[in-house]
């Protein structure tokens, strides 16, 4: 078994694709980790904005969470319809491009790509940050831990969709079991205590502030905007419909409903218990900081084994939340590449039937972010949710146009559902933009514009290439004369002999060029007449010319390139074939033992850009 087989698994045939498809159980960790993990930081993000209100701020977490839950429900029903209408994968890019046009589609694609890169970097950083706060000795190794987790997630995803689902299933279900258990036990205690439960471990008291009778609309809008980070990753299932086994649409819809249902239960339960237990957020930048979930689990269950298992599962899930981006980003890139807005290589599936290039590129870009910020990406959090809500809005608006065009039974009802989704997410997008603009949302806008410009440039290049190589006339064989053949060699041997034999089958006009070096030139000239000219003449052929090129500065490639350019000018009506003899080693570690002149020569000739030059490799395989 090769090293690659051990690292990535044995290659899968296209016929194995059905076996790699997944059901709901595997779909939850693959496509739902990002959304579900947001229960660990979404409510806290909203509560952090309410810290200045003291105890009064805790009262507002329930209505703020209720607004987010209503929005989640609307988006859920909207995306169920998108999955049914686009069973081949109906992400925001596909829907917006098909129904609103090319540019809105690119906006949706760029917004989602940037959001996915942020999800990976910030998710891993948040998980490692929580681990470091629990084990301070690990603080110097923050960046190494981040990059290590990133590498593991990348490798698991390169092994295939099904295997990724199996690997991430256990930590996902442990996270859900412990957090749902906390919500259930806490709710029962609250109900039996008539809404005033006694905490096992009392949370720190809220910030003492002057009497506040009500929160300003601006503070509540900011809290809502921060809490909307809980909705990132909701779209992933609609992009990955083809990953599900038959019945594809039903399995994808069921998975989406389970993910959204679980997230709603978690958000509602956390908000309810936070208010019941009087838990306020603490300032992350000050000593004594505790996460909201840490205080909540302590209040409900104390600081025993259950607390540590729950907090441990949260740390793991925060780190692994990046997996949703690894499942969706490559599929999005493939869809964009199919329309020539990204390199076509993004559309090719690798040895394990996954889009390898998309996975690797996402890991590299996220790794760069982690390197730049030293593994601490708190400053990137304000950029969150902008891309997601922009994509949500364009997708839902596209579905409205879709139902308007398709019509038929149920079209009006579907149009109303998607229209409501478009309005709700559009309003939320404006709120998030206004609330977060000063703290970094403008950076997202610039990045989206830059990425769209890059994609348009790629499309322009492909259009130019397509226009240049396209042909409508049939094959013409008129005026096809024998080419001028040039064979560069450095000494006489089996490699040179094989190249020369092939050259003589193409044309009688063969020139062998040799760059002068004192020892090799003398030896070659002595052998040329006996080893080449005499045998060719005896066979009735025209002996090839041996042309020795001077090189006073000991350059090898430049004299050959100059000679080729000169031959091109002297033979304006002829094709020129350059036969490049090359040694091919059996093992990769032998290549550094040889010079790489053949490869460099080919590169230089190709860069020369003459359309009449044809390069031909004649390999000699080393058997030893």
Give the ranges of each region predicted by the language model:
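Extracellular loop-to-transmembrane helix junctions
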Residues: 47-88, 92-97, 103-108, 122-149, ...
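Membrane-interface loop-to-helix entry segments
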Residues: 153, 158-192, 255-259, 381-393, ...
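Helix-loop-helix junctions that connect adjacent transmembrane segments
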Residues: 173, 178-230, 435, 439, ...
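C-terminal membrane-solvent junction of multi-pass transporters and transport-like membrane proteins
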Residues: 28, 345-356, 392-437, 468, ...
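Extracellular/periplasmic helix-exit of transmembrane alpha-helices
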Residues: 186-197, 256-294
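Membrane-interface "cap" regions at the ends of multi-pass membrane proteins
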Residues: 1-45, 77, 88, 96-97, ...
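Loop-to-transmembrane helix boundary motifs in multi-pass membrane proteins
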Residues: 102, 140-147, 243-265, 337-371, ...
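Cytosolic C-terminal regulatory domains/tails of membrane transporters and channels
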Residues: 1-14, 464-473, 478-624
């Amino acid at each position: 078994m090769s090293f690659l087989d051990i690292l990535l698994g044995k290659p899968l045939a296209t016929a194995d694709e059905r076996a790699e498809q997944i059901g709901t159980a595997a779909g939850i960790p693959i496509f739902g980790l990002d959304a579900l993990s947001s229960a660990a930081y979404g409510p806290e993000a909203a509560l952090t904005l309410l810290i200045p209100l003291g105890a009064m701020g805790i009262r507002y977490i329930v209505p703020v969470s209720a607004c987010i839950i209503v929005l989640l429900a609307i988006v859920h029903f909207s995306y169920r319809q998108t999955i049914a209408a686009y069973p081949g994968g109906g992400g925001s890019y596909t829907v917006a491009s098909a129904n609103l046009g090319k540019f809105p589609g690119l906006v949706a694609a760029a917004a989602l790509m940037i959001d996915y890169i942020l999800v990976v970097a910030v998710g891993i950083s948040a998980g490692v940050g929580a681990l470091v706060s629990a084990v301070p000795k690990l603080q110097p190794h923050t960046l190494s831990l981040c990059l290590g987790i990133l590498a593991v997630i990348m490798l698991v995803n390169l092994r295939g969709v099904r295997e990724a689902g199996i690997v991430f299933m256990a930590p996902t279900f442990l996270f859900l079991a412990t957090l749902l258990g906390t919500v259930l036990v806490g709710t029962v205690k609250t109900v039996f205590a008539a809404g005033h439960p006694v905490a096992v471990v009392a949370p720190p008291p809220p910030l003492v502030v002057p009497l506040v009778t009500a929160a300003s609309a601006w503070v509540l809008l900011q809290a809502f905007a921060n809490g909307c980070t809980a909705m990132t990753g909701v779209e992933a299932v609609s992009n990955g419909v083809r990953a599900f086994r038959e019945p594809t649409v039903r399995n994808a819809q069921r998975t989406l409903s389970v993910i959204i249902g679980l997230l709603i239960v978690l958000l509602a339960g956390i908000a309810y218990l936070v208010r019941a237990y009087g838990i306020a957020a603490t300032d992350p930048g000050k000593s004594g900081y505790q996460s909201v979930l840490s205080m909540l689990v302590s209040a409900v269950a104390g600081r025993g084994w259950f607390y540590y298992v729950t907090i441990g599962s949260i740390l793991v899930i925060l780190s692994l939340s990046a997996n949703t981006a690894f499942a969706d980003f490559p599929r999005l890139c493939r869809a964009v590449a199919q329309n020539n807005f990204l390199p076509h290589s993004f559309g090719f599936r690798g040895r394990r039937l996954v889009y390898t290039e998309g996975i690797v590129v996402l890991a590299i870009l996220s790794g760069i972010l982690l390197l730049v910020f030293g593994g601490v990406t708190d400053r990137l959090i304000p950029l969150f949710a902008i891309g997601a809500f922009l994509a949500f809005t364009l997708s839902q608006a596209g579905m409205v146009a879709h139902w308007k065009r398709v019509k038929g039974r149920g079209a009006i009802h579907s149009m109303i559902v998607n229209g409501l989704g478009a309005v709700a997410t559009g309003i939320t997008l404006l709120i998030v933009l206004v609330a977060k603009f000063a703290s970094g949302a403008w950076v997202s806008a610039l990045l989206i514009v830059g990425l769209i410009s890059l994609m348009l440039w790629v499309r322009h290049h492909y259009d130019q290439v397509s226009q240049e190589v396209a042909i409508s006339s049939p094959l013409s064989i008129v005026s096809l004369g024998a080419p001028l053949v040039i064979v560069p060699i450095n000494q006489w041997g089996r490699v040179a002999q094989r190249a020369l034999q092939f050259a003589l089958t193409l044309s009688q006009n063969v020139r062998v060029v040799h760059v002068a070096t004192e020892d090799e030139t003398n030896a070659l000239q002595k052998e040329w007449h006996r080893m080449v000219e005499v045998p060719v003449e005896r066979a009735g052929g025209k002996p090839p010319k041996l042309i020795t090129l001077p090189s006073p500065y000991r350059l090898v490639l430049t004299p050959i390139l100059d000679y080729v350019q000169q031959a091109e000018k002297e033979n304006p009506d002829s094709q020129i074939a350059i036969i490049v003899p090359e040694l091919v080693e059996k093992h990769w570690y032998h290549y550094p033992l040889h010079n790489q002149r053949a490869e460099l020569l080919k590169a230089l000739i190709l860069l020369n850009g003459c359309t009449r030059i044809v390069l031909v490799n004649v390999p000699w395989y080393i058997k030893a």
